[in-house]
Every structure is written in structure tokens, then in C-alpha cells.
Amino acid sequence: MKEIDWSSLSFGYMKTDYNVRCWYRNGAWGEIEVSSEETLNSHMAATCLHYGQEAFEGLKAYRCPDGKVRVFRMDENAARLQSSCRGIMMPELPTELFEAMVTKVVRMNERFIPPYESGASLYIRPLLIGTGAQVGVKPANEYLFLIFVSPVGPYFKGGFSANPYAITRKYDRAAPLGTGIYKVGGNYAASLCASHEAHAAGYSAEFYLDAKEKKYIDECGAANFFGIKDNTYITPKSSSILPSITNKSLMQLAEDLGLKVERRPIAEEELETFEEAGACGTAAVISPIQRIDDPEKGKSYVFSEDGKPGPISTMLYNKLRGVQYGIEPDVHGWTKVLIE
């Protein structure tokens, strides 16, 4: 293997040694299989190809200053995948099997885990697909769960710095009672046009309002939104927002640090009142928002005049990263050591 330049890694795919797989057949999950193949041999009538029976997750393994390799809240990823399975009628993967497969694939690809000082990490992508053949619209009778990994650099090339976003009314990410709360591929397909147009206009990502009234904050790109004002951490409550594990963790840390926490509808006009704002998720942890433009209304909500992250966002970012890397005390038991 040629030497990897850890410091120049993008947030992209790199071939590693192994992935792990498990089949669901005849009403039961089978044994864990190890593969070095990057491709899948799929039936042309598989439900994942025609009817969107596909759900995935994203988490990371971190090489820490003490030399150990930790993962962050993988039980929450297992629970969210189970929720997605219920939402689109796929068999739920037991938490124990999920965690065993994460552990196995990380250990088998240890040489691809970036060193601590690089700022990079090992991205873990669990994927569950309907493989059984169906021509009518109904659930498959056979499924494949697999996990592959890839070393990745920061999601945003600028690292922990503030980025501009743009409100879109032209597109909706998900319907109010649709699949927005599940991590399924269709939600991301629905965001591709909006994302492309936002990037083409010079923005970091698109910013969605609620699909029903176009009045309330929904998601920003593929991440959850939060705003800070009056020592309060405020994040939207909506039936179409993916429950972010990072956001859930930040809410707890905000409370730990003495902030009030509110999860409630946020009208667009309230953006004017926030002292800080950010997007949060596994990929970037926190991406501070420099400003949110509303091109249709000719308005701009500015949170950072100098482009630097705000003090509370910075404090929360450092605290969460500290827990993930085993630097801060893990008082909530969020991390698990996979490699000593």
C-alpha cells in the first residue's frame, strides 16, 4: 500500500482491505461474513433499486492521543437504523449485531485509521438494502446489511470556520409526514438539485424551510440546525427532520455547561435574534454558520461579521471533540474503545 497523506484526505471514498456483510433470509439474520470485494452482485428486480428500500448510517472511529481507537455512540446509530427499518418495512437489525459488525470492520481495517494529529478519522458507513426481487410495490423477503469504512478528512475544507448558507423555497427535502425522520437514500436524492444550485451560487449548503408552510426552519443541507441566544441552545422541532445524534449530544453538553436547551419550531424571522448559529452532524460535528441569505426576500441573517465561529459554538465543538477523542471525561458513557 502506498503511503497515505493523512493531512490531505478529502471527505470521500478510499478503498480499504475489508467490509463486513450479513444476510437476512427466511425470516432470520445469518452469520457475519468478511469480504474484500467492493462490488455487490444484485438482482435487477431488487427492491432497493426500484422502490427505495434502502437505509444507511454514518459514524466515525477516532485514533486518540492515548493510542486507543474509540467510536462515538454507536448504540444510537443502531437505534436510528432500526427506526428507519420500521419506517420503510425492512427487518430491524439487532443492536448487538450492529455493534459486533462495527467492531469487526474497524479492527480489520486498523491500518487505515488516521493518526490523531492529522485531524482525520475513519468514516464508517453501515448500509441495509432490500435485495429480494419484486415487481409489485411491496417489501422484499431478503436483505443485505453491510458496513464499509474509509479514512476521511474534514467534511468542510475550511475546517472549523463559519460558512454561508442560502434559503431555498424551490425545493423541499421531505414531506411533513414523509420519510424525513429516517436516514433513507430518497431524502438525499431529493436534496441534490438544491445542493447543486447552492454550491454553484457560492454557498456551503442549502437551507430548508418546512414543506407545509415555508415558514419554519427545517434542516440545513444534510445537517440539523441550532441557534444560540440569551445563553440558550435552540434547535427546531419538526416531523420531517432527521434526529441527529450529534445534535442530541450537543443538547446534553449545552445543559452540562449551564445553557438552557429548547427544541421547538423556529420561524424564519427569529433568525434575526440569534447571536450564533450552526449546522451539526457526524460529518462536520459543527459547521458554524457565517450568514444565511434569503435571496427571494433579499435578506441576509448575519451571525459572524468576521467569519469566525462564536464562543459558545466553539466551546461546544471543543467539548464534543474532546469526548470523542478521549481527552474530556466521558461522563455520559458515549464512547467505546474498540482497539486498546
Question: Where are the predicted features?
Answer:
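Charged, gly/pro-rich active-site loop segments
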Residues: 95-97, 105-119
